A protein has these predicted regions:
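A structural signal for short, well-ordered beta-strand segments and their strand-loop junctions
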Residues: 39-45, 93, 111, 134-135
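A short, terminal or domain-edge coil/loop segment
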Residues: 46-59, 92-108, 143-151
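Metallo-beta-lactamase
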Residues: 64-108
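Core catalytic region of metal-dependent phosphoesterases/phosphodiesterases
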Residues: 1-80
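Conserved beta-sheet core of the metallophosphoesterase superfamily
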Residues: 108-188
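Feature recognizes metal-dependent phosphohydrolase scaffolds
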Residues: 3-16, 21, 35-41, 97-100, ...
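Generic detector of short, locally flexible boundary/turn motifs and exposed helical patches
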Residues: 8-12, 67-70, 97-101, 118-122, ...
Length: 189
């Protein structure tokens, strides 16, 4: 998730109060990255969801731009890559967190973009899924054991963005904990 930044679709940017980035450049570069990666499973994150949330916007030019981004995402992921596009629901998706937003690997490991943040985010994700969970939502790297009868861990794997280009987060103390990371490996249940 969050393969697109979509800073131009943030509420503050739409109101003209933020330094916006070129949405076309963002989409072109990031979809090219996905194309080279060739995943068979793509999670939408809260950044990617910005375009989907604007499909019913009251300004036609915003709605039109958002529809173009959504069409480009779905054309690449579902069409060219033949990959599954996993929706992002966050904690408010339909009123509650949705199982549609994660994929389980066996009976003990879940993957999701993520939806909760702060200290203990890894543990919170595991409590929601009922198993060890790998996520990226907070942009930090952390492995956290979960207080449970099972042997669950929350794996927060960081992100692959450029922190220096994320101006909207430059004044947040939490941004100092952001780190680049990538997870890969083999799994046996």
């Amino acid at each position: 998730g969050d393969f697109l930044d979509e800073t131009a679709f943030m509420v503050n940017a739409l109101a003209g109060g933020s330094d916006t980035h070129d949405i076309a450049d963002d989409v072109m570069r990031e979809l090219h990255f996905l194309e080279r990666l060739e995943p068979d499973l793509v999670f939408l994150g809260n950044h990617d969801e910005r375009a989907y949330m604007l499909l019913d916007h009251h300004k036609q030019e915003v709605k039109f731009a958002a529809q173009g981004v959504v069409d480009d995402i779905e054309r690449l992921v579902k069409g060219e890559l033949k990959a599954e596009l996993v929706p992002y629901s966050g904690v408010t998706g339909g009123g509650t967190w949705s199982k549609k937003s994660f994929r389980a690997l066996g009976n003990s490991m879940a993957f999701c973009h993520g939806f909760t943040y702060g200290l203990g985010a890894g543990e919170k994700h595991c409590l929601f899924t009922g198993m060890s969970t790998v996520f990226v939502h907070t942009h930090c790297i952390e492995v956290r054991p979960v207080r449970s009868l099972g042997d669950a861990y929350g794996y927060n794997i960081g992100f692959i963005g450029d922190v220096e280009k994320m101006h909207y987060a430059s004044r947040r103390e939490k941004t100092m904990t952001w780190a680049n990371g990538w997870a890969s490996g083999e799994y046996g249940d």
